[in-house]
Amino acid sequence: MGSPPPSSGAQPKPQIKFDLASLGRVDRLVGGGTLVLFISLFLTWFSYAGFGISGLTAHGYLYIVLIVALGIIGLIAAEAVGVWKVPESSTISRDQILIVATALNFVLVLIAFLLKPGGYGFHGVGWSYGAFVGLIAAIVAAFPLGWPIIQARRGK
């Protein structure tokens, strides 16, 4: 007894192919910046006496950035693969989702950058490369969607 022969009417599985060309310039900047931000969270953000700590270790609230970054990357990747898009009937548009998410990430990363860990006895804490990479990546991810809004509010 074996398995039945495949029927001639069987539908072939659709091929899932990541199409980078389907992404516009804004999506590439938002997605690329967010991917670099995600990676930077695991890099050394602060150093003290030769020891370094990651952004996630120094500031637990950066786990929010980690989760939001995964959501942004997932949304853009799902659209590039063609498996899912934000429904047109949604009350919030795709761009609104990305604006809120990238702005939240930027604000939290800026706060983490400015609030170096320390306190009593830790006056020598300095920034390390991960903090700069993370801040620049958060700016790159938020800028393409945020700048037009800023310009419109200024009346330009």
Which residues fall in each region the model found?
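Compact integral membrane and secretory-pathway proteins
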Residues: 1-156
